[in-house]
């Protein structure tokens, strides 16, 4: 069996900057990835296809795709895209030489093409997305087209999280999925595929019976799911041999010379006019993007990937002496945002796989149909560099590790000081917990470790920590009016998860051994 898994995640960006890092990131991913990917899945659903893939979407991304501010911002962004395309179509001078992507002729053709694309996207958004993503996703879940994977609120790095906050965040994340889609997931994509022994118990108690890890977590043996010893919770591993054929840190299909170049912009319009051309071709010399050439490359790479899957299934089945499972897993944002032709490739692949005689299913299908091997002791791991915790717990982010531990400790101290039996929700405590969760998102350490908008990431972590602390200080001082005003002000920017109720954290028991923050330094070594 072949199982394709897509994981969709962005940190909370609403109200926190626009460009180059901020809401622009959300709107680019929405237009380039989420619109076309769900359009393709909708077409396949209309044709009667089911059990196509396993789709993870984090609560923090789902919140933005349903948020009124983000919906309005996305509509404006799409209109601006159309205006930029119109501007490019009418350009009368350019710096590029004839035959290059930045020539007048190439930019005019680009403008015409982008105008059609933006018009399509506006139509899709206005007809299907104006009330958010939930009405788009829910029918696909209910009809069995996709299996939905859940995740904890706000995407924390769970192995380093206090067990009470970890349990609360996971349970609230699963309930958030249920409220949005009338479906409580039984599968999970843990943030960063991160694991530490004991988390399997958290999963079992929350009704999770399978989750994703990276292939090395299973010592590279991903041909079957493996129950984590002592539980019925099955870990499925990403097959790197297959997944890296599409995308890896060093290679993959998107680098083909015919595909649109992600990094080359026309700076006057912000549009991308060039094809990759060659790995060493400088931007001024890149050739204009040619959709026909790109489409031909897509067909070639669909056929190639099918043969990769077929060969892997045969070799793994022969090795283990029974039918094997191959799991390929990717960020959804690869398809469209990073790899312009990705949605086209994805739809053609999903059509071609059954025609090629390859059995396709979801992770839930794989578990139900017995693609499960012997129990395993799962080690501390992640899908980051080194497959350990160094990205989120290394020396480069030791200050953020310490900050996260302090934020959680201070938030729990506030919660524990709450009256034991509050009859009504406490908006002050709710917002304090909301800010604490945003402060400890794993995205900030990742961005710092990878030196990707590291300043923005540090600012965000400290901003949310400051918000939590000033609310807590006012509450501790008995200044209820100031605490309420601060909570309301921060809620204007960070009003996600409106059903979050701090009283539930007050009564959350610590059900697993605490992975103390001090272990982060040891894990990094």
Regions found by a protein language model. Name each.
Residues 1-52, 57-112, 222-525:
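Active-site and substrate-binding clefts of carbohydrate-active enzymes
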Residues 194, 199-208:
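Hydrophobic, small-residue-rich alpha-helical packing segments that form membrane-like cores
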Residues 29-40, 125-134, 168-173:
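Aromatic- and glycine-enriched glycan-recognition loops and surfaces
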Residues 150-172:
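Glycine-rich phosphate-binding "P-loop"
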Residues 208-220, 359-363:
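His/Asp/Glu-enriched short active-site or ligand-binding loop at hydrolase and phosphoryl-transfer sites
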Residues 184-195, 331-335, 453:
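Conserved short loop/turn motifs at secondary-structure junctions
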Residues 166-190, 308-329:
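CE4/NodB-like, metal-dependent polysaccharide N-deacetylase domain
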Residues 42-49, 131-149, 178-181, 316-320:
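Acidic (Asp/Glu)-rich catalytic clusters
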């Amino acid at each position: 069996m072949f199982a394709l898994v897509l994981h969709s995640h962005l940190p909370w960006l609403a109200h926190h900057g626009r460009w180059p890092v901020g809401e622009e990131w959300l709107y680019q991913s929405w237009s380039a990835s989420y619109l076309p990917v769900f359009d393709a899945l909708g077409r396949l659903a209309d044709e009667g296809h089911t059990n196509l893939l396993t789709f993870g979407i984090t609560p923090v991304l789902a919140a933005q795709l349903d948020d009124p501010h983000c919906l309005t911002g996305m509509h404006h962004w799409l209109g601006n895209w159309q205006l930029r395309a119109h501007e490019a179509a009418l350009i009368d001078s350019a710096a590029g030489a004839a035959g290059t992507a930045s020539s007048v002729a190439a930019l005019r053709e680009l403008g015409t093409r982008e105008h059609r694309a933006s018009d399509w996207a506006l139509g899709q958004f206005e007809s299907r997305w104006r009330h958010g993503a939930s009405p788009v996703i829910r029918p696909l879940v209910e009809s069995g087209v996709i299996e939905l994977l859940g995740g904890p609120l706000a995407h924390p790095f769970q192995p380093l999280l206090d067990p009470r906050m970890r349990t609360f965040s996971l349970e609230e994340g699963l309930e958030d999925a249920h409220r949005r889609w009338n479906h409580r997931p039984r599968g999970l994509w843990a943030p960063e595929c991160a694991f530490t022994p004991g988390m399997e118990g958290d999963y079992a108690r929350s009704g999770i019976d399978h989750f994703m890890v990276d292939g090395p977590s299973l010592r590279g043996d991903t041909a079957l799911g493996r129950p984590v010893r002592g539980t019925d919770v099955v870990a499925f591993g990403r097959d790197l041999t297959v997944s890296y054929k599409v995308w890896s840190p060093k290679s993959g299909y998107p680098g083909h010379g015919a595909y649109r170049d992600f990094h080359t912009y026309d700076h006057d319009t912000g549009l991308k006019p060039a094809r990759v051309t060659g790995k060493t071709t400088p931007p001024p010399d890149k050739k204009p993007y040619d959709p026909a050439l790109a489409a031909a490359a897509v067909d070639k790479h669909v056929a190639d990937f099918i043969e990769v899957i077929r060969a892997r299934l045969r070799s793994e089945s022969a090795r283990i002496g029974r039918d094997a499972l191959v799991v390929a897993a990717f960020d959804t944002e690869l398809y469209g945002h990073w790899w312009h032709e990705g949605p086209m490739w994805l739809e053609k692949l999903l059509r071609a796989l059954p025609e090629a005689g390859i059995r396709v299913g979801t992770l839930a299908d794989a578990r139900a149909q017995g693609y499960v091997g012997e129990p395993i002791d799962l080690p501390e791991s992640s899908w980051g560099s080194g497959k350990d915790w160094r990205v989120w717990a290394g020396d480069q982010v030791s200050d953020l590790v310490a900050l996260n531990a302090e934020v959680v400790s201070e938030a729990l101290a506030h919660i524990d000081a709450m009256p034991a039996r509050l009859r009504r929700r406490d908006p002050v405590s709710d917002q304090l917990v909301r800010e604490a969760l945003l402060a400890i998102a794993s995205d900030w350490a990742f961005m710092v470790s990878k030196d990707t908008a590291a300043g923005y990431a540090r600012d965000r972590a400290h901003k949310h920590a400051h918000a939590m602390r000033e609310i807590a200080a006012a509450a501790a001082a008995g200044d209820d009016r100031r605490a309420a005003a601060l909570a309301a002000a921060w809620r204007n920017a960070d009003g996600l998860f409106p059903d979050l109720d701090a009283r539930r954290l007050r009564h959350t028991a610590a059900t697993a051994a605490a992975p103390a923050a001090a272990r982060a330094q040891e894990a990094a070594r």
